[in-house]
Structure formats: C-alpha cells, structure tokens
Amino acid sequence: EKGTIKTEHIVNAGGLWAREVGRMVGLELPLLAMEHHYLLTDEVPEIVEFNEKTGKELIHVIDFKGEIYTRQEQKGVLLGTYEQACEPWSPLETPWSFGHELLEPNLERISPSLEIGFKHFPPLEKAGIRRMINGPFTFAPDGNPLIGPVPGLTNYWSACAVMAGFSQGGGVGLALSNWMIEGDPGHDVFG
C-alpha cells in the first residue's frame, strides 16, 4: 500500500499480473499465462542487401496460416510462433515476485511452426539461430486481446492479453483511448 490515487478511469493493462490486478476489484478475468517461444536468427544476407539497397528495414509480418510472425531484428529476424502444443505457465496466478525470468526453450515443440516459417520465408531456413527465447504471455480464450469496458464497474477498462505487444499494442491503445473519450473504439475489436 503506497496511498490512495484518485482517478476518473482505471485501465487494467497488468500484463502477466492482469489476473491479480482484476482480483483487486473482485474480477476473475478469463486469462491464462502460457509459454511463448520466439527465436532470433543470425545475420541474413538477403536482409542486409535489402537494407543497403532501400535504406529501410523489413516490415513486421504476421502469417496467420503458418501461425508465425516476423520482424527485422538487427541484421536478422525475430521469428515467433503461435504454438499449437501450448504449455500453461503458472495457471492460477503470477507471483508478484516474478521478474520476467526466461523459461527453458523447447525447440521440438515449436518445430512444426518453424518448418512452415522456413517454407514461407526461404532465406530463414539457412540462417543460424542466434538465440531462442521462451517466456510467459497472457492469453484470452479466443486468442484476442481482452479489451473494453468491464460490465458492472464504471470507468474500469481492460487492455489485457495483448500478447503480441509490438503488433497489437498500438491498435489496442488507440481503440481503448477512442472508446474512453468518444464512446466507441472506432473499429471492430472483437473480430
């Protein structure tokens, strides 16, 4: 307890602790912390060539069929997977003491997604893996962000389960700010 804060609106954007933040006001949010993998490749010559020719970085790409996403990371790529064989992490609560420590990676578990990624982005198949990361994210049951006003709690808003922060964060922030100020998110946030 650090004192009282008076405000017109409250936004639960608690990330891994969104469940705990919700419980502070009596909410049990439908969220689950799951393991989530991504990898960083070594330098990819085709990317270096593209950067030098255009003076630009590669765009962020989501391949829904392949259940992967990529973005340029230095002179290589960050390649993330939306795993079919998901593993829950701390299913009931996230300890307040958790400091974003990484979890043990499992290359075998994500190899089906990686194979699709390599097929859809052939230069990545030849790239070495510089680092493999596995860390927890919160997910809603439908895989979409849990966003909007919370029924029964005036001016209490949810911006939770934004698991792909660099691809969804800006849109979630814009929709929520429109909703809070204008009364409408400005587009369908439930699709």
Regions found by a protein language model. Name each.
Residues 57, 65, 74, 87-89, ...:
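C-terminal catalytic lobe of FAD-dependent flavoproteins
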Residues 1-103, 112-123:
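Flavin-dependent oxidoreductases
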